[in-house]
Amino acid sequence: MDPVTFEVLWSRLISIVNEQAAALMHASFTTVVREAGDLSAGVFDAQGNMLAQAVTGTPGHINTMATCVRHFVKKHPLETLEPGDSLLTNDPWLGSGHLHDITVVTPAFKDGKGVGWFANTCHAMDIGGRTLGAGARQVYEEGVNVPIMFLFRKGELNRDLIDILRANVREPDQVVGDLYAQQAGNDVGAAKLIATMEEYDIGDLEGLSTLILDRSEERTRDAIAEIPNGRYDDEVSIDGYDEPLQIKIAVDILDRNLVVDYAGSSPQVNWGINVVYNYTHAYTTYPLKCAISPEIPNNEGSFRPVKVRAPEGCILNAEFPCAVGARHLVGHFLSQAIFGALSKVIPERVLADGSAGLWNTQLEGVGPDGRRFAYIFFSAGGMGASAVADGLSATAFPSGIRGVPAEAIEAVSPVRMVKRALISDSGGAGRFRGGLSQEMVLAVDSDLPAQHSCMYDRTRFAPRGFLGGADGQA
């Protein structure tokens, strides 16, 4: 394939997955997806290798999908499927680490032959069980666990599955509506891909896939080779549930290879903050890419030079059936450990500590109209500063999840945002200051009782400043 054609096709793939994500968001029933962007979308070759991802999305979804799709391919190889088939799962140990994230995978066919896959992951507004949080002791308490199964078969909806979900979730219309939106996104992506293949007379994706993945791998290895060989370590303390936890990390650079080892980190706990390996891998590779190779496409090829190790049974490689609902309260701190280790060798490329763990606010109750409601939205503290710029205020990193506007919250629920304001001087001082945190005051416009669940961290251990900068506020 000549270089010009390759670049055109690569640009087309990026355009296609961005249209896939846009279609999903436009069709979504929930502010979690269409406003906060808690989703991912990507295209995969016939073997399940991730080729390209949409710009909109979160690392905890897109990087776990790179592994998750292979489980679908193993259980349902392309040659066993037909046009109109589509599959899904929310198994935390196959996907993105908790039951609220549902992955929908759809094969793409050209002239009756399977040529690739489109997949997306979205956060469901509800999945049954306990209210989303860290209070469960086992995953069985956290909601409905759907193994890999058909969502559509030859174009026919799996109504038994839909009936089970409707009977178990608090917001059935929103949950089922988003499944249709996810399917719509994949269908748009597949249609655009096939049109492109026909335009350029391409029979399959094998040649293009090999070029994309091999080039990404080589460029990533070249970027790693620019860092001096050695072992760089760090340790991060976080609140935990009832006692603090430690994340210990060693980053080994050896020529064109990189190994991350979390040996010595705290063991898994009896609360829902445990992290499955897929999620650990996702939030390890993302900050590494930010620091080492930000311009290189994020795909299966760029993952090849990086090995991630976490002992079985530790907080970062938790074993079934432990509870995992609030796994992000630990997993989002991996970027701080990565940057802490790399600050010893490439300090100009990393961020200081920030708030890290995404804030989840969920309210459940009965509205003034007598209807039950369950609503969740996300917020964040500040990002750490870099060596060249202030940290962003009220911005989620590393998740990239957007805060939901007060107007959007109030339009679809009886929740009222009484106050939302930045907290002065909450970011650490320095030549470049840390981003500011925020204060929120909420109310429910109903005389009937409501339940509030909030997930957060950074109440015991302040975010660290780097290169002589001051710590931020806990």
Which residue stretches match the model-derived regions?
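Glycine/proline-enriched, intrinsically flexible loops and inter-domain linkers
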Residues: 1-83, 88-110, 114-474
